[in-house]
């Protein structure tokens, strides 16, 4: 704090109690400095950023599907979950009526989506956008679980998540905070269902 820079006109900053976008409660996790929206994918801002991360070059890497297209498809109600991206072909006729979408561009987009139906487990885990899970941690989880099905079975909301947490912290380079975020993510029934839906696509 630079006390000498104070003028006397400073005011106390009140942290928001709710998200300015979706109005869900904004809470500050213990030990952190920032408040976070609890709205999840029900929050338009989180949905947009989450899907943008999902299709990014170092995640699913879907060519031709960037921030502009994601925002447009969300606004149209076509994409509300990651799995919806792989169902966007159902909207090809409606897409053809939009500005900037000719037959060739639609075919290229659908082809780019189709070839990414199978990716490495490491990329898949990273694409989920789990807090504190970057490429290195995603690689560790992929090596440990071996398959998406095994990972989902071990981290199901119906499983013993305390035991799953203990297994995670025993993995070299995964600490308690990261293990907490991983079990909290998969332990959320709504998020878990979205992942199961995604895998079926």
Placement of each model-derived feature along the sequence:
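Accessory alpha-helical DNA-binding modules that contact the DNA backbone or grooves
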Residues: 2-201
